[in-house]
Amino acid sequence: MKLRPIWFFCALGLLSFGTAHAETADSEQPIQIFSDKFDGDDVKQVAIYTGDVAVHQGTLEIHGNKLVLTVDPQGYRHAVMTPLKGKLVTFKQRRDQKTPGVEEWMHGKGNELTYDEKRNVLILTHRAEVARSENGVLKDESKGDKITYNLTNSTAIIDGNKAKGPSGRVSTVIAPRDSNMDAGKPLELQGSRRVSP
């Protein structure tokens, strides 16, 4: 089937979100997509993976129940991963090591993970959460109804859901400064930031 280029390049786009801070070697690894079923339509430029879908590239792992990859008439790729009812889409990826002996991981989850190549954004929606851990210890965490990460300028917008009342607010936890850290070195913020449109 001629569909290989469609899902392959869609998957590349889907997986490119982590390259700025992710393990550099991951982008050089093959992309593997596993599922219980695959349906492809070369004419409509659609590839659908269903049933315990797992996407792997190096240390990057994305898990859900359904992955829909499409290419629009202008050639832009779009990918949407959704979970089983009552579950969440999850991803994790190791970051490049900055400090010897410290292994950092990024973890995320939400009801839906979307990659939009035209806008060059990655979006986690509904019960969205992104966290960073060091050697298995949670360091920073951001939660909201929608997390939009712009791959072009490395900015994030986290939106709450006011309709949910106080529980619909955005929350961010930032780890305190490490007492072993050089006092003259600025603290690298790993949480979220709100940017003006």
Language model region names:
Residues 1-197:
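Mature-chain termini and adjacent capping regions
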